[in-house]
Every structure is written in structure tokens, then in C-alpha cells.
Amino acid sequence: MQITVEFSGGLETAFDGNKKHVLDVPEGSSVNWLLHHMVETLMPDHKREEGKNIFLQDESVRPGVLVLINDSDWELEGEDQYILQPRDVIIFASTLHGG
């Protein structure tokens, strides 16, 4: 099944600058599965360790990263336990900015 994943607020740099990805994922996959799948398949090898540290902390999304599932805060949807559905749009937006 297909889902769309989008990155903003600088997170796209960990994913080789690509802000939008359309992914085929197995039915029954959770957001937790998706997080690890993205690190392994969307992050370039030479950026994986640094990118993982920007994106994840303790095997979940790092504090300061807003996650929206179909424009709804992921906390309302079960966070990383949410089971992905066909045509879901998952947005990861960093709320931390340097300055």
C-alpha cells in the first residue's frame, strides 16, 4: 500500500534533501516500523548516523519533531503504534531552529 511521507524544518537534510517521498509499505505496518524503515532506506549511507541522531532519540522521534498523521497530531492517533492506512500522509516537521 502507498503512503506519503513529508519532511520540513530542516529534517529533509537527513534524507538527502528530499522533502516528499511516496512509499510502498506492507499492510499492518506501524509508524514505529516506518521510522526504522526510513532510516535504513531513505537516509544515504554517508549521512545515516548523523541523520539518525537528528531524527530519532531512544528509538522514537526526537523531542522537537512534530509528527502529523493526516494533519492530526500523532499523539491523538496512538503515536508510533498507529497502524498505517492506504494513502496516509505522515509529516515530520522540526520545530527547533538555529539562529
Curated annotation (Swiss-Prot):
Signal peptide feature range: none
Modification note: C-terminal thiocarboxylation occurs in 2 steps, it is first acyl-adenylated (-COAMP) via the hesA/moeB/thiF part of UBA4, then thiocarboxylated (-COSH) via the rhodanese domain of UBA4.
Modified residue annotations for 1-thioglycine: 99
Subcellular location: Cytoplasm
Principal cellular location given in the protein's record: cytoplasm
Assigned GO CC terms: cytosol; nucleus
MF (Gene Ontology): protein tag activity
Top-level taxon: Eukaryota
Pathway: tRNA modification; 5-methoxycarbonylmethyl-2-thiouridine-tRNA biosynthesis
Gene Ontology BP annotations: protein urmylation; tRNA thio-modification; tRNA wobble uridine modification
Pfam families: Urm1
Keyword annotations: Cytoplasm, Isopeptide bond, tRNA processing, Ubl conjugation pathway
Keyword match tRNA processing: yes
CDD domains reported for this sequence: Ubl_Urm1
Record-listed cross-link Glycyl lysine isopeptide (Gly-Lys) (interchain with K-? in acceptor proteins), residues: 99
Function of the protein: Acts as a sulfur carrier required for 2-thiolation of mcm(5)S(2)U at tRNA wobble positions of cytosolic tRNA(Lys), tRNA(Glu) and tRNA(Gln). Serves as sulfur donor in tRNA 2-thiolation reaction by being thiocarboxylated (-COSH) at its C-terminus by the MOCS3 homolog UBA4. The sulfur is then transferred to tRNA to form 2-thiolation of mcm(5)S(2)U. Prior mcm(5) tRNA modification by the elongator complex is required for 2-thiolation. Also acts as a ubiquitin-like protein (UBL) that is covalently conjugated via an isopeptide bond to lysine residues of target proteins such as AHP1.
Family stated for the protein in its record: Belongs to the URM1 family.
Protein name: Ubiquitin-related modifier 1
Organism: Yarrowia lipolytica (strain CLIB 122 / E 150)
